[in-house]
Curated annotation (Swiss-Prot):
Top-level division of the source organism's lineage: Bacteria
Designated gene of the protein: PPE21
One GO cellular component term: plasma membrane
Family: Belongs to the mycobacterial PPE family.
Transmembrane segments: 14-34, 180-200
Protein name, entry field: Uncharacterized PPE family protein PPE21
Length: 678
């Protein structure tokens, strides 16, 4: 175990949660007693056999008995010396433990430090607590270093104690009989406390281990003819799938060449649906990525039969249209041919109205440029709106060309802009920044989802590229509240932190199951790798509630792993039900247990990742201001609700370092903003 990568929450808990030095002291006392008993037995046995050999029992039988008895007496004497050495080494182990315990930071101090950090982060809306947060983090790093030093020292001393022990030699009678491990079905089976290492399959023709099925070259499969590992299904080349004929890993469905899909025959990753060529689609028959709908050619569309990106509607050809059957960019309405039109049936650019032919007309049924009114033919002003700088603007307060919305800096926008520091091109959304956005308050390119930051996101409050699920941080995610790439799970619960997961609430990659900590698990609530069973701690288990390797049986226990409070947990020191990973706990007197977490040191319910506080979070160090409650957050170091991205504080946000509500982009302190530095 690499203690240097474990935080003080785990290292301190490992030292303080055990039984302490008492059992080892008892063992030292027992070894001392055994040494005395063996020494007395050796002396007594030698005296008795000597009296027999020098007395009435003479002849060849007596001589043979004397030789065997002498050998056994020597073994008793040697065993007594070895028992005395074991007693001394047990006492040395006690001394090493007590020294390490004294050098380890108390878990209460670690918990108080983390509680102080959460309080500072929750109240740091204006950044005023930054120095205090830095100081708390510095103390935490010192705790981490102290625990690592203590554990490494303890490991070194304990290893030296173990290496100095002399192995016990078998007795003469035992040496004459065959020994070794128990053999079951031709494979070894060991029992190491609550750790089991199985090696048998519950069917025939398997090359791998721990399979519930036949003819599997891989291991821990529930099914047949799987070349990969931990699949529930048949004929999978990849690992961690629920389904059949998958070439990739972590799929829920059939015939997927890639990974993390929920559906059938997807050529790409992170899709929910079937027959998609691309990634992160929520729908079927899409040629592209990040679409919500069917038969789209392009990215970030919400609707059907769109060619292009960032459209909200159906049968659009272009970018950033809100409506149907538009040919162009940034139109709001239907059947427009051109860009930046606010209305329907327009041919041209920047018209505010319907059935206009031309540029910058404000009205209906006009033919010409800059006309204000209806049913006119001719040429009006350069701009038909007021306060414009440019040409062909029918809205107000624009700088640029062919804008039918207001306050835009750019070209061909039918939505309203944000103002300074934001530039819009071909956008139909309100207060968006970028190109071809039909989603309100979006920053980037081709976003049809609201409050998104990035490229071609068709769902709300996402940060990244080609996400069709809501509140994702990353790329090609069709599920909700995921932090990572190509995750299709998370709808109605919480997403995952990792890569290509089709299940929900996973911390890891290629998991088709849910609430796992690790990789390639098709079962649920596992801590480890390649498990097709449920609630296992270890590797390649197709049974349930196992702690170990290659087990295909179900164990009659409440948890797998160690030091849990509750039931159906895997891993280490979780309190509650259906948790995997390490030290997931409520730490709240009003909520003793937590449910459905994966990862490390999460506080709340249905969290995936590391040190999240609240409910329904994925990522690293995210929190909700009230400590408890539904957050719906993905990403890193966010505080609030419905947030994706990095270092955001508020609600309904995406992007980086924003500090108010309903914001996308970067470094914004105003509400209802997109872009940069508002």
């Amino acid at each position: 175990m690499n203690f240097s990568v474990l935080p003080p929450e785990i290292n301190s808990a490992l030292m303080f949660a055990g039984a302490g030095p008492g059992p080892m002291l008892a063992a030292a006392s027992a070894w001392t007693g055994l040494a005395g008993d063996l020494g007395s037995a050796a002396a007594s046995f030698s005296a008795v056999t000597s009296q027999l050999a020098t007395g009435s029992w003479q002849g060849p039988a007596s001589a043979a008995m004397t030789g065997v008895a002498a050998s056994y007496a020597r073994w008793l004497t040697t065993a007594a010396a070895q028992a005395e050495q074991a007693a001394g080494q047990a006492q040395a182990a006690v001394s090493a433990f007590e020294a390490a315990l004294a050098a380890t930071v108390h878990p209460g101090a670690v918990s108080a430090n983390r509680g102080r950090l959460r309080s500072l982060v929750a109240s740091n809306l204006l950044g005023q607590n930054a120095p205090a947060i830095a100081a708390v983090e510095a103390v935490y790093e010192q705790m981490w270093a102290a625990d690592v030093a203590a554990m490494l020292g303890y490991h070194g001393e304990a290893s030296a104690v173990a290496l100095s022990l002399t192995p016990f030699t078998p007795s003469p009678s035992a040496a004459a009989t065959p020994g070794g491990a128990v053999i079951i079905a031709g494979f070894p089976f060991l029992d190491l406390g609550n750790v089991t290492i199985g090696g048998f399959n519950l069917a025939s023709g398997n090359l791998g281990l721990g399979n519930l099925g036949s003819f599997n070259p891989g291991s821990a499969n529930t099914g047949s003819v799987n070349l990969g590992n931990a699949n529930i299904g048949d004929l999978n080349l990849g690992s961690g799938n629920i389904g059949s004929y998958n070439l990739g890993g972590g799929n829920t469905g059939d015939l997927n060449p890639d990974s993390g899909n929920t559906g059938t025959l997807n050529w790409g990753s992170g899709n929910i649906g079937s027959y998609n060529l691309g990634g992160g689609n929520l729908g079927s028959y899409n040629l592209g990525s990040g679409n919500t709908g069917d038969t789209n050619f392009g990215g970030g569309n919400t609707g059907n039969l769109n060619v292009g990106g960032g459209n909200t509607g159906n049968s659009n050809f272009g970018f950033g249209n809100t409506g149907n059957v538009n040919f162009g960019n940034g139109n709001t309405g239907d059947t427009n041919f051109g860009s930046g039109n606010l209305g329907s049936g327009n041919i041209g650019f920047g018209n505010k109205g319907s059935h206009n032919i031309g540029f910058g007309n404000s009205g209906n049924n006009n033919i010409g440029f800059g006309l204000t009114g209806d049913n006119q033919i001719g040429f009006g002003a350069l701009n038909s709106g007021s306060g414009n700088l440019g040409f062909g603007n029918s809205g107000n307060g624009n700088i640029g060309f062919f804008n039918s919305g207001n306050n835009n800096i750019g070209m061909g926008n039918s939505g309203n802009g944000v103002g300074a520091l934001s530039v819009e091109f071909g956008s139909s959304a309100e207060r968006s920044s970028g190109f071809g956005n039909s989603g309100e308050l979006s920053t980037g390119i081709g976003n049809s989802g609201q409050l998104s930051t990035g490229w071609f996101n068709s769902a709300t409050t996402s940060t990244g590229w080609f996400n069709s699920g809501t509140t994702n941080t990353g790329w090609f995610n069709s599920g909700t509240t995921n932090t990572g790439i190509g995750n299709s799970g998370g709808n109605l619960v919480t997403g995952s932190m990792g890569l290509f997961n089709s299940g929900h609430t996973n911390t890891g990659s290629f998991n088709a199951g849910s609430m796992n900590t690790g990789d390639f698990n098709s079962g649920n609530v596992n801590t480890g790798y390649f498990n097709s069973g449920n609630i296992n701690t270890g590797f390649f288990n197709s049974g349930d509630l196992n702690t170990g390797l290659f087990n295909s049986v179900n164990q009659p226990v409440q948890n797998s792993g160690w030091l849990h409070t509750g039931t159906n947990n895997s891993g280490y020191a979780n309190a509650g039900t259906f948790n995997s990973g390490f030290d997931n706990n409520a730490r709240d007197e009003h909520a003793e247990f937590v449910t459905g977490n994966s990862g490390l040191a999460n506080v709340g319910n249905y969290n995936a990742g590391i040190i999240n506080v609240g409910d329904h979070l994925s990522g690293f160090r995210n929190s909700v201001p009230t400590i408890t409650g539904t957050a719906n957050i993905s990403g890193f170091v966010n505080a609030g609700t419905s947030i994706s991205g990095f270092f955001n504080f508020g609600s309904l946000m995406s992007g980086f370092a924003n500090f108010d509500d309903e914001v996308s982009g970067y470094l914004n302190g105003d509400s209802r903003a997109s872009g940069w530095i508002h």
